[in-house]
Amino acid sequence: MKLNLKIWRQESKNSKGEYVDYSVDNISEEASFLEMLDTLNESLVSENSVPVAFDHDCREGICGMCSLVINGEPHGPEKATTTCQLHMRHFKDGDTITIEPWRANAFPVIKDLAVDRSAFDKIMQSGGFVTARTGSAVDANEIPIPKEVADKAMDAAACIGCGACVAACPNASAMLFTGAKVSHLNSLPQGKAEKERRSVLMVQAMDQAGFGGCTNIGACESVC
């Protein structure tokens, strides 16, 4: 498979960026999207050119590190699929693929496609935890939790913090991320003692980090 790539290149947060055209050939349909970028970077290195910087770690859809806007869609065309789990069989030979970083004031570009998402860390540090000692695993069954409540908390805890919700939102709001983290802990008995304080502090941290406000558009949910 031969592909044409239009990739955002930017040296640093304060430098001016631009799209640069590349092409890659002999890409397997079974290759992942990041493996395709690896192939491009190997080619660039062999030409003594600077490889494209992009975030990645586990490549298993778990860690939340991968963060690419592919053809205008955070994580690409496949729903409920992270960039690292996207495979090239979803593209056609000869396609032109536009690749850019998350776009948000709170997520400044570090280099090329890599962005600084430490604003999420600040939200978590403000209240995304339970300060009371909750005991060891042996003690967990001492507090019965209805299955419906446990399921709700687990659904919220499934957020991997990738930031696609922010990238999709026209306001660059982090309310889906913040709401998930608040809901996760506030749903459980161990977290209820601090739920009001937690909610206020985490929303304040979100606002202070420079995220926009939520206007109930729903773009965040569609890419989560």
Predicted regions and their residues:
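Eukaryote-biased recognition of intrinsically disordered, low-complexity regulatory segments
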Residues: 1-23
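Short beta-strand segments
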Residues: 18-22, 82, 97
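Short, contiguous acidic and Ser/Thr-rich linear segments
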Residues: 20-32
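Ferredoxin-type iron-sulfur electron-transfer modules in oxidoreductases and energy-metabolism complexes
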Residues: 31-50, 97-223
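Long, hydrophobic/aromatic-enriched structural stretches that serve as scaffold segments
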Residues: 49-50, 65, 69
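Short, structured protein-protein interaction patches enriched in aromatics and acidic/basic residues
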Residues: 53-65
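Glycine-rich phosphate/adenylate-binding loop and adjacent beta-alpha elements
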Residues: 70-91, 99
